[in-house]
A protein has these predicted regions:
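Basic, alpha-helical terminal appendages of large translation-related enzymes
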Residues: 158-196, 427-430, 439-444, 523-534, ...
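N-terminal catalytic cores of NTP/NDP-binding nucleotidyl/phosphoryl-transfer enzymes
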Residues: 193-259, 288-303, 412-413, 480-516, ...
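Catalytic alpha/beta core of large soluble enzyme barrels
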Residues: 223, 236, 430-531, 536-538, ...
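Long, charged, mostly alpha-helical binding arms that flank functional sites
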Residues: 169, 392-396, 529-532, 538-570, ...
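Residue patterns forming the tRNA-binding/recognition surfaces of aminoacyl-tRNA synthetases
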Residues: 168, 177, 181-185, 256-416, ...
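Helix-rich, typically C-terminal accessory recognition domains appended to large enzymatic cores
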Residues: 121, 244, 309-324, 497, ...
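N-terminal interaction/assembly modules
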Residues: 1-161
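Non-catalytic terminal extensions that flank enzyme cores
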Residues: 158-211, 367, 383-392, 577-580, ...
């Protein structure tokens, strides 16, 4: 029986129309058939076939509706268009009960009928629903759970005779087997080879929490696909993994679990390493490192000493960001919205103490310049770094103190408003505050205000919602150009971290200053006015912020305010009251941490010699492991005499060891260099190997590190270059910032957020209350919308999890978690498995077709689709990392191959050779994504070894050429027909063929044609 001849399709179309009619009437099916069938001319056998379809659908309607509804939560029959519903029931009936019609044929025919009756939207919808139904039924067949009486295409009943697939897809058996094989053969190990082009692929290494989360899985799967693809393209690939092992999380967890951070960390490393291996990631584990290993941080200590000797590391007393919960200092970059980056519920306060700093400001200009030389970095990251570095051109201006010889220096980018400065504001941290208030009646009020303000974080102090407050110091200074005495305030919105910690306040042209002046009844002076009108201070209700003409500005009156910036700066320099300068928002990197679990700072304090570095030959300064941690989170190091008491390297007298440890971002600022030579013990880095591998060609990680790890790494790389350890200036050539993994929350009115396993049929398992489904947000333990990757691996296998993480969205976009999506990925892999296994005997008889030859359809379609897919997947992976569209293209190739195999095309040796090429291409293209199943199928087809050693396929340009193309025909925007035209047809020829089409003529008959629109030779719209 031919399954998709023109007559057969006509019979199906008749059946659909009858079923559609029955949606609106109570007619008997045969009566409906008689009414509708009058318009159809077809052979008696086809009429009988159509009647059998209608009768079967009506008899099995309840069962069909149940299958359609249960195939996904995303659709319900009662919400579907009636026509779509009729087509779906018919196709589902064929797939379930007509065993002599291949299910894929039923699906394809339904899609075509949907296209004919409902247009592209209907066709796409039907295809999506039926694909899910097809996969569901396929899974049931594999598991022999689908057992019912079957019908054949003639409408007669036959007993079910479905047997087991010869070889079942069992990922839980084959995946560990292949992982063992890969490890034994050392296939992932990298070695320097000057004859080969290197490719260094790296994902940001994890903190060893003990359990990988789905964000890890997505991030590392993205990297693994790229690494495997590049290796198949002939590159010498380095793909290492290690552990960001120091830091407060391990220390806090150890305190909570009454254990030692070292034990906690190394046990977690072992557990996570096992999990990562179970995912099949292609890591070179010989290069594994942990930053808490003394053999790693000894070289970090050496570099610190070298930086100290070069003046790039120093210690000073300063106001620092302090987290009470962490009991340690935070760098500016670690304060987010005024709170600790690790404890967003806790506001950061200011504390004065001695701290160690690295001079990142020395490299600000160079890093800023190179922001324009990193085209492989996202614009968003570069913008964030530029803004954080914050380079500003302006002027430094001296405001002499009244009654004293000192002056207060101000940095401003708005020297054009200098004549309007009517008061001065200092930051509470400004070193001159204590000096200028000493002995004055305002001293206590000012000190109280300073202490109160320093308890607020910088973000809160400058936020719009915070009231702008200040206190008069009792002192004045001179405006250097007007010579007017102006009052000096201490204000909460002025930060010592920016500029000089002092601002000249111009209330008429700055809204914040305006509000402050109004609050404290301070003088206003307009110095910029619009070109066509005047401004009066008494009439102002807000500051004038637009550009304009200078007034009340001495010799600069009448000039445009922006045009006068340079001339005013020159005037200041000429008169010795200021000079042009550049200011940066970025401040030196404070690396001191008052915690235990970190790299000891290798410095010694001697009462006679001051600060002295540890002798380089005495490195590493090893963190003692026999200390008991303090429950308040503070470091035990200052209280351990065996650690603190030492001798001075200079005078050999008694001395004290530095007890601060380094910010853990120091360790992560160079680990990627050490991967190139993890076994090197003559220094931090082996120049020869580092020169071969660095820079990292592709780095992958979260955008949350834009002004933390990524900025620090760029700085540290420059330092290592200047110290002579490496030759590169930038560590990462290309950067991909992956999106977050998101999932809807579930809340119980009594128990709050619930884990997925605590919800049973939309009810709380603890109290049976109805559960509310909330917004789709980033997965987090606090909201309990997390998914355990291990549970998924145990259920579906690693390949399915890998595939879903790549297929659900592009890597730089957020991924919305979907159980149905995971199911769909698993079912697709089952289809690929059966594509090989079901035809293995025939496939093994032939070789894949690799010659040039002209074919005829349907074989030509398979041949063309094979090479189209190679081209599409290569482009998507190589140029865009759009793995989702690459996978979709392979799915289309699988559909095309199955369509041919289920059709009536000749199945001779040539055909099987072309099919083998298609099947092998499918397996090869999928191998970076799902390496276990593809290596297994590759071996089944008679090959030896892993696909990782198989060259990535090239496409044949000749095979992509097509003689005909499909053109969609519309009348007034509605699809009415489709025609095939020669690929070389002109627009005029296509227009003529469209107007001659029988269906188009039927819809334009008796109407005037206003115009005919031909769109890119793909669509014709006839407007009547």
């Amino acid at each position: 029986m031919k399954h998709f001849t023109g007559e057969r399709r006509k019979a199906r179309e008749l059946a659909v129309q009858v079923l559609f009619h029955l949606e609106f009437s109570d007619n008997d099916p045969l009566e409906a058939f008689r009414l509708i069938g009058e318009n159809f001319e077809m052979a008696e056998s086809m009429t009988d076939f159509s009647k059998a379809l209608v009768r079967g659908v009506c008899d099995q309607k309840s069962k069909l509706d149940k299958v359609i509804s249960r195939s996904s939560k995303h659709w319900r029959l009662e919400r579907m268009a009636r026509l779509d519903r009729s087509i779906l029931r018919l196709a589902t009936y064929e797939m379930m009960f007509l065993k002599d019609i291949p299910p894929r044929v039923s699906l394809d025919e339904a899609v075509e009928i949907g296209k004919r009756f409902g247009g592209e939207d209907s066709s796409r919808y039907i295809n999506g629903v039926l694909d899910n139904i097809y996969n569901t039924l396929d899974s049931q067949r594999d598991e022999e759970t689908f057992s019912t009486t079957e019908h054949n295409s003639e409408g007669t009943k036959e007993p079910n005779n479905i047997g087991k697939v010869n070889m079942k897809y069992n990922p839980l058996e084959l995946e560990p087997r292949w992982q063992t094989h890969w490890e034994k053969t050392g296939i992932f190990k990298a070695k320097e080879d000057p004859s080969k082009e290197k490719y260094y692929l790296l994902e940001m290494f994890p903190y060893p929490s003990g359990k990988i989360h789905i964000g890890h899985v997505r991030n590392y799967t993205i990297g693994d696909v790229v690494a495997r693809y590049k290796k198949m393209c002939g590159k010498n690939v380095l793909h290492p993994m290690g552990w960001d092992a120091f830091g407060m999380p391990a220390e806090n967890a150890a305190i909570e679990n009454n254990t030692h951070p070292a034990r906690w960390t190394y046990e977690n490393i072992a557990a996570m390493k096992t999990q990562l291996k179970r995912m099949g990631f292609s890591y070179d584990w010989d290069r594994e490192l942990a930053t808490c290993d003394p053999e790693y941080y000894r070289w970090e200590q050496l570099v610190f000493i070298e930086m100290y000797e070069k003046g790039l590391a120093y210690r000073k007393k300063t106001h620092v960001n302090w987290c009470e919960k962490c009991q340690t200092v935070l760098a500016n970059e670690q304060v987010e919205d005024g709170c600790c980056w690790r404890h967003p519920e806790l506001e950061v306060t200011k504390k004065e103490m001695n701290s160690w700093f690295l001079k990142i400001t020395d490299y600000a200009d160079d890093m800023l310049e190179y922001c324009e030389k990193l085209p492989g970095w996202p614009d968003r990251v570069m913008t964030m770094q530029k803004n954080w570095i914050g380079k500003s051109h302006g002027a430094a201006i001296q405001f002499p103190m009244v009654g004293a010889g000192d002056a207060i220096e101000v940095f401003t980018t708005r020297q054009d408003t200098l004549y309007g400065a009517t008061f001065m504001c200092l930051a509470p941290e400004h070193p001159m505050v204590n000096e200028i208030i000493e002995g004055l009646s305002q001293e206590k009020a000012v000190l109280d205000f300073v202490n109160r303000t320093l308890k607020m974080d910088s973000i809160t102090r400058t936020a719009d919602f915070t009231a702008k407050e200040g206190v008069f110091t009792g002192r004045h200074c001179l405006n250097p150009v007007t010579r007017e005495e102006i009052p000096i305030f201490v204000a909460n919105f002025v930060l010592f971290d920016y500029g000089t910690g002092a601002i000249m306040a111009v209330p008429t042209h700055d809204q914040r200053d305006f509000e402050f002046a109004k609050k404290y009844d301070l003088k206003l002076r307009v110095v910029i006015k619009p070109e066509d009108s005047d401004l009066n201070e008494a009439d102002l209700t807000e500051a004038y912020l637009d550009r304009g003409i200078l007034v009340n500005s001495g010799p600069f009156d009448g000039q445009g305010n922006l045009e006068a910036l340079d001339s005013i700066a020159d005037y200041l320099e000429t008169n010795g009251i200021g000079h042009k300068t550049v200011n940066y928002r970025i401040r030196d990197w404070g690396i001191s941490r008052q915690r235990y679990w970190g790299t000891p700072i290798p410095m010694i304090h001697c009462d006679d010699c001051g600060i002295v570095p540890v002798k380089k030959e005495d490195l590493p300064v090893v963190l003692p492991l026999d200390l008991e941690l303090r429950s308040n989170g503070g470091s035990p190091l200052p209280f351990d005499p065996t650690f603190t008491e030492t001798t001075c390297p200079k005078c050999s007298g008694q001395a004290r060891r530095e007890t601060d440890t380094m910010d853990t971002f120091v360790e992560s600022s160079w680990y990627f260099d050490r991967y190139a030579c993890p076994d090197y013990n003559e220094g931090p880095l082996d120049a020869e190997r580092v020169d071969y591998w660095l820079p990292v060609d592709q780095y992958i990680g979260g955008i949350e590190h834009a002004i933390l790890h990524l900025l620090y790494s760029r700085f540290y790389t420059r330092v290592l270059k200047d110290l002579g350890h490496i030759k590169i200036k930038e560590p990462f050539t290309n950067l991909l910032t992956q999106g977050m993994v998101c999932k809807a929350t579930q809340q119980c009115p009594e128990h709050g957020y619930l884990y997925p396993k605590e919800v049973v049929e939309d009810r709380c398992s603890r109290c049976d209350a109805h559960v509310t489904v909330g917004n789709i947000v980033k997965m987090s333990k606090s909201k309990k919308n997390v998914v355990d990757p291990q549970e998924l691996i145990d259920r579906y296998g690693a390949d399915t999890v890998r595939m879903f993480c790549l297929f659900a969205s592009p890597p730089d976009k957020d991924l919305e978690w979907s159980e149905q999506g995971v199911d769909g990925s698993y079912r697709f892999l089952q289809r690929v498995w059966r594509l090989v296994v079901d035809h293995l005997e025939e496939l093994k008889k032939v070789k894949a077709w690799n010659e040039k030859r002209d074919f005829v359809d349907p074989l030509k379609s398979v041949h063309r689709k094979t090479h189209e897919t190679i081209k599409k997947v290569t482009s998507d992976v190589e140029n865009r990392f759009h793995f989702n569209t690459a996978i979709s293209a392979v799915m289309e190739l699988v559909n095309e191959t199955n369509h041919f195999l289920n059709g009536e095309g000749k199945k001779d040796a040539l055909a099987w050779s072309v099919v083998r090429k298609s099947v092998e291409t499918t397996v090869i293209l999928l191998s970076p994504v799902v390496p276990h199943i593809t290596d297994e199928l590759w071996q089944m087809m008679g090959h030896v070894g892993s696909l990782l050693n198989v060259p990535w396929p090239d496409y044949n340009e000749d095979a992509l050429k097509t003689e005909k193309k499909l053109v969609i025909l519309q009348v007034n925007g509605k699809v009415r027909s489709r025609i095939e035209v020669a690929a070389s047809s002109s627009e005029m020829e296509i227009e003529a063929l469209a107007l001659a089409d029988e269906k188009v003529q039927r819809h334009v008959k008796g109407k005037a044609i206003k115009r005919v629109i031909v769109v890119q030779k793909k669509l014709v719209n006839v407007v009547v």
